[in-house]
């Protein structure tokens, strides 16, 4: 008869009672020298056995076979003072649990077995009184206690079995001699006649080492005998075995559970994070090589509405940085086309292209490089970094993302030349003109586009040359002479006024650019010419004998002559103000 193969650990959960007195203080140890035995762990009630039913751990054949005692292999002492056997109301003290007692606990070590058979035997052995091994009966199903079930289910080493598992196995004390082993850890508790409660835990999983001829006696009131052999243990159906395997095995994504709590991963994919407020996914790539350039190690590949798109963006960025050695979310064979395209681009250019293909970020960042949304105005602002003492340079606010992206591109070309990483294609800009331009970079960056467009449009329009301007002045002089030679020359003609709106429309053709200095010089010449013509006309109509008759004329004639000399100057009173062009 082999020793039982269970590893039961039982301890009392009730107030301790007085251990029964005994003439012998030596504990009887059992032998666990069988090749397939696993000794039970027993830490039972600290009081004597009060039930009159016969108790035994092994049959008499097993006790006779246990010839070799392990009395010489003591490794630890009992927790109970042997003097407690002589007291009926003794309560255990702290020293009782510190190993200073004279009682001995036997330890069995079998070198022939594959596993080490360690046992913490009974602290109190009822065989001293009944010549039989004792184990407490009247056990109940431990599954009924939800508190212990939740407590032991959290252990990594053992879990509370279901009702089917406990039904297949017999809890501690249900059988007098031997506890039927199960495929998993078992829990049980005992309520004795004295109201005490003992807890048993079976942690033995070696179900293959069975005895074919185990005979057990049921420890109930009927004393029913039960025969259990190895065939009963091997009668598990295939479905039960598959069920046990499925319960243990875990999927590949078990470690990639989505958790919305703070401090945990928010995506099942590598390099992807989920925004806590908006629910959008962003792809991030950590690059340590750019630390020497003053940039942050965390690069952004854009924001996405779907998680798999963000994972693909991370995979492409990782393949660009680390080639085939990169750890990707999807197989590398899925990116064969993209790998060929990224060979002709730098790392920064490829990352910028990934951002442009995204649907924007969650926290105000734009899909364009160097562009962010203002948190109050709602407008888009452009900044460029590492240009002014390793600091950001503010480029202004813009109505659209595209305008802000163009301002960033122009500033990048200005400071970094043809090697600049831009949001749009480089052939969109005149790189040489931008690099030679003296316009400031910053608040005037958004006016740079208008200046370039005005310069481009002026090249297409006809320019008024010096020869054409001289010919035009001669035509205007001829028209003035014709008007002055007319009989009604005293009438006011606004066509003669060089600063009038009518003449300005005739002099300057629509759509022809001009310089303000040249136009002012032209107006001065016309004014001088008009004054000369007026003086000539005045002396021609003045009477010749006005000077000889001046002494003899009366006061009325003098007043009339004086009023005639005070003719209004048309250039002074009838000139329209200069218009701002």
Swiss-Prot record:
Keyword DNA-binding: yes
Subcellular location: Nucleus
Keyword Zinc tagged: no
GO cellular component: nucleus
GO biological process: ethylene-activated signaling pathway
Role, per record: Probably acts as a transcriptional activator. Binds to the GCC-box pathogenesis-related promoter element. May be involved in the regulation of gene expression by stress factors and by components of stress signal transduction pathways.
Protein name: AP2-like ethylene-responsive transcription factor AIL6
Organism the protein comes from: Arabidopsis thaliana (Mouse-ear cress)
Name of the gene: AIL6
